[in-house]
């Protein structure tokens, strides 16, 4: 399995394709074990796509403490440095877009282009402790857990009042 040992943790990553490098930073709950993912789409036909499990998710290390947005951004920089990539196009989706912004602010010389999808500015607060989500959840249980975390329109109160909406 492809791991990179950075200064702070072991990061699981996968890459596919050739040509100009693109760093793909996934959203809440992103895990490269989920298929299909960005590596199965058309992007690797035109780029060298690097995707990784962020700290606390998938097969990347899960330090047992809150994570800062600066750490997430630095993880991306350390991964690229370990791969010998000096400059990259970055695609950040949802929470990954927040991470991409922190990466771009902290490491501007590494970013050639920045594409932000379905995201917000985020902030400097620690992220949700994704490493505390059990790995053995059923797909439905995982969905319900992630909805409560990522969709502020559907918090626990809303879920309790609209159980029929969640059964779809």
Language-model segment annotations:
Residues 6-61, 65:
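Conserved HGGG/HGGXW glycine-rich cap/lid loop of the alpha/beta-hydrolase fold
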Residues 50-92:
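Active-site loop/oxyanion-hole signature of alpha/beta-hydrolase fold enzymes
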Residues 101-106, 111-142:
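Flexible "cap/lid" loop of the alpha/beta hydrolase fold
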Residues 142-168:
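Conserved alpha/beta-hydrolase catalytic His-Asp/Glu region
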